[in-house]
């Protein structure tokens, strides 16, 4: 096993939010400062653009494919819808997504630009970061942010000559304080039994980067999120860190985050001990059961009760994100319907000054 570190520039998305003449005004618009920072993570399920490059999955390319420009644009609209639902679930104003959105399975920076272009005015995302996939890879991780992206770094695990998906490390300037976001999309469980070993290598890499950050900056504020492709009981070295499913998810009896809840610790989450009212208890549905494989980990400084603090964690299942069966409404290319086979997860960080 070897590691390779790469640096990538963040994308300035000023051009997304309107014509060139109006960008400055749009970027100066601000949402009310509630003292809260909201973050969403979402595996978008094979989000390719409409231009064929050869790396797409078979069903997305070729003359017989049902994939088209029209269906791509429709998927962008649905992704915006999911992001807005994530905003509502984390207490943002109506029609506004979370402050930071981490997306997995994005084909390229162009897709990130296209989705960013669907958010305007005070709800716009002026900043973004995207780490290109390795040659031959189908997709990677993208990040949209209302806060300046100070730095982006990618770390990759190479095992048996195969580059695993990168660990993205983005530093955001959140109202004068740095927040480091580690974003991942780990090896899936499909294939042979070696996938568990590969995920362990990715877990060790993330732990190594967290320890390196905390060694240089004790008390650093950081979160780690994404599709980890494993549940809480399958972690090894990360099991000692606070996690949304067991550390800052709250009981169903507590009030749901809404735009009216702008202070204090009143938050909501999907309990891991039982089903929610909708039957949802996880972010992914597999083999007849819910699994919590999309995670948020957080630094000790965000859960120790001092200053900025994780106020809550929840799965987003509103709108049409669930199929009539009660499972995630996965995207089906043959019909052009659906969203993703995962549900978004969100957190709210309270008392951020």
Task: Write out the residue ranges for each language-model feature.
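Bacterial N-terminal signal peptides that target proteins for export
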Residues: 1-10
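Bacterial N-terminal signal peptides
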Residues: 9-20
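Short, solvent-exposed loop/turn and secondary-structure capping segments
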Residues: 50-54, 112-118, 140, 153-156, ...
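Active-site beta-strand/loop signature of hydrolases that rely on acidic residues for catalysis
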Residues: 39-44, 72, 79, 83-112, ...
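Metal-dependent phosphoester/phosphodiester hydrolase catalytic core
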Residues: 53, 173-208, 214
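Metal-dependent phosphoester-hydrolase catalytic domains
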Residues: 24-28, 208-222, 230-353
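Structured beta-strand-rich core segments of catalytic domains in phosphoester-bond hydrolases
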Residues: 44, 100, 106-187
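N-terminal, active-site-proximal structural segment of metallo-dependent hydrolase catalytic domains
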Residues: 23-118, 129-134, 323-337, 350-353
